[in-house]
Swiss-Prot record:
Descriptive protein name: 2-oxoglutarate dehydrogenase E1 component
A GO biological process held by the record: tricarboxylic acid cycle
Keyword annotations of the record: Glycolysis, Oxidoreductase, Thiamine pyrophosphate
GO molecular function, one term: thiamine pyrophosphate binding
Catalytic activity: N(6)-[(R)-lipoyl]-L-lysyl-[protein] + 2-oxoglutarate + H(+) = N(6)-[(R)-S(8)-succinyldihydrolipoyl]-L-lysyl-[protein] + CO2
Family indicated by similarity: Belongs to the alpha-ketoglutarate dehydrogenase family.
Originating species: Buchnera aphidicola subsp. Schizaphis graminum (strain Sg)
Enzyme class, UniProt record, top EC level: oxidoreductase
Pfam family, one: Transket_pyr
EC number assigned by the record: 1.2.4.2
Lineage start: Bacteria, Pseudomonadati, Pseudomonadota, Gammaproteobacteria, Enterobacterales
CDD domains: TPP_E1_OGDC_like
Reported function: E1 component of the 2-oxoglutarate dehydrogenase (OGDH) complex which catalyzes the decarboxylation of 2-oxoglutarate, the first step in the conversion of 2-oxoglutarate to succinyl-CoA and CO(2).
């Protein structure tokens, strides 16, 4: 092939028919604006226009079907394409140009594709009236210049609508319609505007009053973001109109006091007393005032709306999944529509993008186990995180709300200085949530007038930012001036509003008028209440029938052979041929609870089958994949049984289940870790909520944690639930910590949790190898006739002339028992402590009365010396032992890691440990 011919072929090959659609799209963009395409394409199209003929026809290598045809330019068509292009560009990218920063910290960027010059409109074209599909109406006549101005006002004003990344076209069209039809000037009438102004002035005056009355005291002011108060009131107004029965708020400390007084109507004098240290509660340790929550009843005609503010610690964003759990419990237990419940989570700009629990929580939002019909997210975006204000140091994305994109949630960025735009944004968000039952985000861009707290001097680290803030008018001033200019109010009227509100603060009176019918209740007394149900007597025949019932699978279901064998064995257990294993006893416990009309909810990774293949609460049909759940088919009036294989999360899932457990009803809520080792992924939930919420907030929970625990050679990440950490948290009867070793014990423990008067979280270190071990099985008679034993005494009556008593907990008991039997030892007692906290002092003393002569006592544990129960239990046991006796420990040596990584090392350690327990010599 000649060189010049080859070059011509190469230069024209891009015109292949295979590329036609692609080239036409690029050519259309070129005709709208030549600079919008790559320079290479500009050259080719420019050359093509000059030649005005198909260059392929010049060569013998032309494609015979003449696939590329010369494009004729239709000016009207190009004009229409330009108009459609500019409309779609504003919808997709208008938010980038929006005026959302009240401080104007950064120079406003110019986006050429949002300017009319980019599209090469002639002056005549700008004046031309066209018919377009704008505002989602059928046809709309408008001049091109006016169209541009409308687009600019709607999409590049005080709200940046970021939503076109959503894949669902119906959702996008719905949002577009509401923006283009309803977002306009003069949205609100005089009455509404005056109401907004009052709410802003209340929030502003409250902060100033607190600042003067308690100067230099931390209050985590809302100043700069008072628009939040009006937004929350708008949510209440929406709830009244839309038959919402409950609203639950989750928020951090920023602005919390303002919300308590100006939204929940907390009495100001009560708050002032908290500042002054007056009337401190004595029955619990309490918490700082900006962590407190509460509940308010709002009368709505003859109905009531319950507005709750969830208690939370300083650990940012962890309250989010707790709020969702509270919401799901209300929806389930009250059997109400998702649209009758509003979940509102209020975030900070640094924490929403910085805290991983947000991603975990959002991931749960549309899953069957955790969805609640969507959440309204409001970000108090004060453009700073403590002392960090450079976005490059705060996040790797442009916006703090970019995490919303992972769940296809729309984001409305709004300038908090524009109150009316902020109200429109929350109205749109509420409508979207109701329509699509999905999460939606309000990015309320504001500022923080003071430092991180009122003691902090922000000028030290943000001098430029705070010079702007110092000279920036307050939101109240801005809106007051606007309404004065609109002749809707006078400065004298405004002074009277402030004066009247201030008088209420001075007098310590509730600031919200009584005709609004809002009263504040002390959440520490009545936030969550447990209604106890009396225990019911078990009947052997009834329990036997129940065991048959939950293990009988319909013939129409094709059961996996391994599962079929398990269920056949369970029928044998009902017949009395086989003792009950752990999984059977556990499921039977749920069945007895469900028969009483009490609901059970279980969640965790692999929980329906069980990590160790022992539960099988779900039966998967091997032919069609359908699922049969025996515990959902006991009888008509049974309680609701839910068991959910959770998302792969510990922190958010456990927090959700904690929130669920707070609902004031008889409900057994259980979270199971895949292995107990992984529970520390949710350590903040354990520390800040489960172990301490009752003492801090008088908030009660009966949540159950199943934590598989036991040293079996599986290495440092699959051996220990970190028992020592739970025991370190034990005080003031806050939780229960149990390590049951027999199947009957888990049966009784679960029933005790729901039927007893004790309403505390329960931590259960569950077994692994014992799940199917014959030595850990129980008879049906034991399940019916006995109760949970905090301590299990020696079971071998042949142990005589006792010289040593070994105390232990958990699986190691069976290793000790095996060694004792193997070595034919008959003078050492093995006593199992099944409940470590509250410590069963009386039961142990009762047992020891028979052995007052024994001087040699051992605490034996599998865990290393610095872990496990030893440092918790040594003083407790020592005070119970006879005089002049000795208490020693046997354990693995102190170690940084919980367990050895190799099975051979594990076996040697275990062998030495068991041998030492029997052969330990007292010095």
């Amino acid at each position: 092939m000649k060189k010049n011919t080859l070059e011509k072929w190469f230069n024209s090959s891009w015109l292949s028919g295979n590329n036609q659609n692609y080239i036409e799209k690029i050519y259309e963009s070129y005709l709208i604006n030549p600079k919008s395409v790559d320079i290479t394409w500009q050259d080719k199209f420019s050359d093509l226009s000059k030649k005005r003929k198909n260059i392929l026809k010049e060569e013998k290598f032309v494609y015979k079907n003449n696939s590329f045809k010369e494009i004729k330019i239709d000016k009207q068509e190009i004009l229409e394409k330009k108009i459609n292009y500019i409309i779609n560009t504003f919808r997709k990218k208008g938010y980038k140009k929006s005026l959302i920063d009240p401080l104007k910290l950064n120079e406003q960027k110019k986006y050429k594709y949002l300017e009319p010059t980019f599209y090469h409109f002639s002056e005549d074209e700008l004046k031309k009236t066209v018919k377009i599909d704008f505002k989602n109406s059928s046809q709309y006549e408008i001049k091109i210049r006016d169209l541009y101005e409308q687009l600019n006002n709607k999409y590049c004003g005080s709200i940046g609508f970021e939503y076109m990344y959503i894949e669902n076209s119906f959702e996008k069209k719905w949002i577009t319609k509401h923006i283009e039809l309803f977002f306009k000037e003069n949205l609100f009438i005089k009455k509404e505007k005056i109401r907004f102004l009052k709410e802003i002035l209340y929030g502003e005056t409250f902060e100033k009053y607190l600042g003067k009355k308690f100067s230099g005291t931390k209050r985590f002011s809302l100043e700069g973001g008072e628009t939040l108060i009006s937004i929350l009131h708008e949510i209440i107004r929406y709830s009244k109109k839309n038959d919402v029965s409950e609203i639950i708020l989750g928020m951090a400390h920023r602005g919390r006091l303002n919300v308590l007084v100006n939204v929940l109507n907390k009495n100001p004098q009560v708050l002032f007393n908290e500042f002054s240290g007056i009337n401190i509660p004595k029955e619990y340790s309490g918490d700082v005032k900006y962590h407190m929550g509460g509940i308010t009843k709002i009368k709505n005609d003859k109905k009531k709306i319950y507005l709750k503010l969830a208690y939370n610690p300083s650990h940012l964003e962890i309250v989010n999944p707790v709020v969702l759990g509270i919401a799901r419990a209300s929806i389930n237990q009250l059997k109400i529509s998702e649209n009758k419940f509003l979940s509102i989570n209020i975030h900070g700009d640094a924490s929403i993008i910085g805290q991983g629990v947000i991603q975990e929580t959002l991931n749960m939002s549309q899953t069957e186990a955790y969805k609640i019909g969507g959440t309204i997210h409001i970000v108090i975006n004060n453009q700073i995180g403590f002392t960090t204000s450079n976005p490059k140091n705060l996040r790797s994305s442009k916006y703090c709300t970019d995490v919303a994109k992972m769940i296809q949630a729309p984001v409305f960025h709004v300038n908090a200085d524009d109150i009316e735009a902020s109200i429109f944004a929350i109205q749109l968000a509420l409508k979207f949530k109701k329509k699509f039952k999905k999460d939606v985000f309000i990015d309320l861009v504001c500022y923080r007038r003071h430092g991180h707290n009122e003691v902090d001097d922000p000028f030290v680290t943000q001098p430029i930012m705070y010079k702007k803030i110092h000279n920036h008018p307050t939101i109240g001033q801005i809106y007051s001036n606007l309404l004065i200019s609109e002749k809707l109010i006078t400065s004298n009227d405004i002074e009277k509003i402030i004066e009247k509100y201030t008088t209420k603060l001075v007098q310590g009176k509730n600031v919200l008028s009584q005709e609004r019918n809002i009263t504040f209740q002390n959440g520490n007394k009545n936030f969550f209440i447990k209604k106890q149900k009396e225990n019911t007597q078990l009947n052997f025949l009834n329990i036997k029938d129940l065991l048959y019932s939950i293990n009988t699978i319909p013939n129409s279901i094709e059961v996996h052979n391994r599962v079929k064998k398990i269920y056949q064995e369970r029928i044998g257990m009902a017949d009395g041929q086989i003792l009950l294993d752990w999984g059977t006893a556990e499921l039977l416990a749920y069945a007895t609870i469900l028969k009483e009309g009490i609901s059970c909810r279980l969640s965790g990774e692999d929980i329906s089958r069980g990590t160790f293949f022992h539960r099988h609460a779900f039966i998967h049909d091997q032919n069609n994949g359908s699922i049969y759940v025996p515990l959902q088919n006991i009888e008509k009036n049974q309680g609701k049984f839910e068991i959910w294989d959770s998302v792969l999360s510990e922190e958010a899932v456990l927090a959700f289940e904690y929130g669920y457990s707070l609902f004031p009803s008889n409900n057994l809520t259980i979270w199971e870790a895949q292995f107990g080792d992984f529970a520390n992924g949710a350590q903040v939930v354990i520390d800040q909520f489960i172990s301490s919420s009752e003492q801090k907030w008088n908030q009660k929970s009966n949540l159950v944690l199943f934590l598989p625990h036991g040293y079996e050679g599986q290495g440092p990440e699959h051996s220990s639930a970190r028992l020592e950490r739970f025991l370190q948290l034990c005080a003031e009867n806050n939780i229960q910590v149990c390590i049951p070793t027999v199947s009957s014990q888990i049966f009784h423990l679960l029933r005790r949790q729901i039927f007893s008067n004790v309403y505390k979280p329960l931590i259960v270190l569950t077994p692994k190898s014992l799940l199917r071990n014959n030595v850990a099985r129980s008879s049906l008679e034991v399940l019916v006739n006995e109760n949970f034993k905090n301590v299990i005494n020696e079971i071998d009556k042949n142990q005589k002339e006792v010289k040593r008593i070994i105390f232990c907990s958990g699986k190691i008991y069976y290793d000790l028992l095996e060694y004792r039997n193997k070595c034919d030892i008959n003078n050492v007692l093995l006593i199992r402590i099944e409940q470590l906290y509250p410590f069963p002092k009386d039961e142990i003393l009762t047992i020891l009365k028979s052995y007052s002569y024994v001087q040699d006592f051992i605490w034996c544990q599998e865990e290393p010396h610095n872990q496990g129960a030893w440092f918790y239990i040594k003083d407790l046991l020592s005070t119970l032992l006879p005089l002049n006796s000795h208490l020693n420990y046997v354990s693995r040596p102190s170690a940084a890691s919980p367990a050895a990584g190799h099975i051979l090392i594990h076996r040697k350690e275990q062998e030495k440990l068991i041998n030492n327990a029997f052969n330990f010599k007292i010095a």
